Amino acid sequence: METFIQQLLNGLVLGSMYALVALGYTMVYGVLNLINFAHGDVLMIGAMIGLTILQLLEAYVPGLPGYVQLALAILGAIPITMLVNILIERIAYRRLRNAPRLAPLITAIGISILLQTFAMMIWGRSPLPFPQLLSSEPIMIGGAMISQTQVLLLVLAALAMGSLVLLVERTRMGRAMRAVAENPRVAGLMGIDTNRVIVATFAIGAALAAVAGVMWGANYASITFTMGVLPGLKAFCAAVLGGIGNIYGAMIGGLVLGIIEALGAGYIGDLTGGFLGSHYQDIFAFVVLILVLTLRPSGIMGERVADRA
């Protein structure tokens, strides 16, 4: 039972990060009908910027509490990451809105490689240690352990997702986003600035990815210029699992995928008689993707996004 609780906690932590990144995928798809496969590398940029801010704080303002340093790293990473994503939309995607679907897809792959190359040039090829700023004393829950960093990650993820729901449901910008997602042409005729809405969508997705990136580094204590590839692909699987285009689906899909992956890692050895180890846990996300696309393409939430191509 303790193993189950431990893996469940691990899954919630992992799933929270997947959910934050999946929201970026699903929001962009909702308003543009486009999959931004470079989004995982936006997470990487957020983590790198966060680490740079922590290094500057250590050099020029030593002695700050760990929570304060993490908060400043996240607050500093968000605007820079938002700017990067806005530039991606403005330079790369805006001209391709009416292009065949293959063009934005190839462009996204090119942007991903470009971001990784820039990160490698600035921060180097080698993995970078991410400082552990919070106490290593674990918190015990039902015989299972969770670190203070992981508790903070869960709290921040909940706050970020709750804030997004309030923005989408209760603000003028949120109503504009829903209108553009429903029918961009009609939204434009109603006086909604669709370009502004699309830019805001990319910015919000980047902010969520920045939070996930900094907390990913804090949780795993190491980051590298290729770190965004696998989490980005898994977050895409989570978005598809939940129902891409649906923000609630992205949240649920991220959490479900994280739990499936963690439970799979914990029990795969027993299930296969020791033939497979926990290092095969990455296969679960893609098995889930194949099953969802085969059995329920609309995802858990079951909302079919209109094909506007």
Residue ranges and their predicted role:
Residues 1-22, 49, 60-73, 99-103, ...:
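Membrane-interfacial amphipathic/re-entrant helices at transmembrane-helix boundaries
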Residues 14, 145-224, 247-253:
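Helix-loop-helix "hairpin" substructures at the membrane interface of multi-pass membrane proteins
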Residues 18, 70-78, 202-203, 209, ...:
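Transmembrane alpha-helical segments in multi-pass inner-membrane proteins
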Residues 47-53, 77-84, 111-119, 156-165, ...:
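Hydrophobic core segments of alpha-helical transmembrane domains in multi-pass membrane transport
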Residues 61-111, 118, 252-257, 261, ...:
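Alpha-helical transmembrane segments within multi-pass membrane transporters and channels
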